[in-house]
Swiss-Prot record:
It catalyses: N(6)-carboxybiotinyl-L-lysyl-[protein] + acetyl-CoA = N(6)-biotinyl-L-lysyl-[protein] + malonyl-CoA. GO terms for biological process: fatty acid biosynthetic process; malonyl-CoA biosynthetic process. PROSITE patterns: COA_CT_NTER. Its main location: cytoplasm. Keywords: ATP-binding, Cytoplasm, Fatty acid biosynthesis, Fatty acid metabolism, Lipid biosynthesis, Lipid metabolism, Nucleotide-binding, Transferase. HAMAP family: AcetylCoA_CT_beta. It comes from Bartonella tribocorum (strain CIP 105476 / IBS 506). The gene is accD. The keyword Ligase does not apply. The lineage of its organism: Bacteria, Pseudomonadati, Pseudomonadota, Alphaproteobacteria, Hyphomicrobiales. This is Acetyl-coenzyme A carboxylase carboxyl transferase subunit beta.
Length: 306
């Protein structure tokens, strides 16, 4: 059937003037099976409208929805040595990086930016799980440290959206070194008395959980996010016991006091803005109520009614 698909069908389409339908126009909700039009899903921040299931969202899309009017200024990530260990598994590490960079159009998995949320200036840092599983390496470590340095220099709070499978094995000890480096950067932010809020997204595991993802002043998680150090399968094989249902889910961690709150992505901006105002002792934003009708307007409406 390949000759029909590869030759006959395109020929017929070209004669009849039919256009090829792009893939992924409709995206399936994995919980309900509902098919959602991709533009509707993007407008809803990749949250399924009926089930509330939180799908993965790119770093750029997250920042567009997070900052006021979708306006932000990206911070340039520092340059680092590529593939210092000349690592190779099934594929050369440097080739793997080239593939991801070509596919996603970014150098690594960290995107940091400055902007405002409800008028408050902040620095936001987002890990993109699509780039090598959000793994923590030299490039991402340097980018995170720069974001903290920028927040301190500009006297802004920092909000970090974590999404990672852990340390990047292709960089060995150089990857693990980013854990204490980011920890020091956090301490410097706290010494400057600036807030640090962490949003834990699905998944947040490994060395990221063991470092900057769990050192915030406030920890917020998205619904249904998996958060932990080792994965549940590894733990179960190690201790040879059945784990509780929903173990490592954001709701389970909230119930057991590991995080402060679980917040929908649709309410994240408002929630974080409110928290930052409390932490920085800024006045609350008061939404003006609609003006009440004047006496003359009231009497006029009564006259018309009569």
């Amino acid at each position: 059937m390949n000759w029909i698909t590869n030759y006959v069908r395109p020929k017929i389409n070209s004669i009849l003037g039919r256009r090829e339908i792009p893939e992924n126009l409709w995206i399936k909700d994995p919980t309900s099976g509902e098919m959602i039009f991709h533009k509707d899903l993007e407008a809803n921040q990749f949250v399924a409208p009926n089930s509330g299931y939180h799908m993965r969202i790119s770093a750029k899309n997250r920042l567009v929805h997070f900052f006021d009017d979708g306006v932000y200024t990206a911070l340039e990530n520092p340059k680092v040595v590529t593939d210092p260990l000349k690592f190779r598994d099934e594929k050369r590490y440097i080739d793997r990086l080239k593939d991801y960079r070509s596919k996603l159009g970014v150098d690594d998995n960290i995107l940091s930016a400055r902007g405002t949320i409800e008028g408050l200036p902040i620095i936001a840092t987002v890990q993109d799980f699509a780039f090598m599983g959000g793994s923590l390496g030299m490039a991402s470590g340097e980018a995170i440290v720069k974001a903290f340095d920028t927040a301190i220099a500009e006297k802004c709070p920092l909000v970090l959206f974590a999404a990672s499978g852990g340390a990047r094995m292709q960089e060995g000890t150089l990857s693990l070194m980013q854990m204490p480096r980011t920890t020091v950067a956090i301490e410097m932010l706290k010494e400057a008395k600036l807030p640090y809020i962490v949003v834990l997204t699905n998944p947040t595991t490994g060395g990221v959980t063991a470092s900057y993802a769990m050192l915030g002043d406030i920890h917020i998680a998205e619904p249904g996010a998996m958060i932990g150090f080792a994965g549940p399968r590894v733990i179960q094989q190690t201790i040879r016991e059945t784990l509780p249902e929903g173990f490592q889910s954001s709701e389970y961690l909230l119930e057991h006091g590991m995080i402060d709150m679980v917040v929908s992505r649709l309410e994240m901006k408002t929630t974080i803005a409110r928290l930052l105002r409390l932490m920085m002792k800024r006045p609350a934003v008061v939404t003006p109520s609609p003006p009440s009708p004047t006496d003359s307007q009231t009497s006029l409406s009564k006259t018309k009614a009569a």
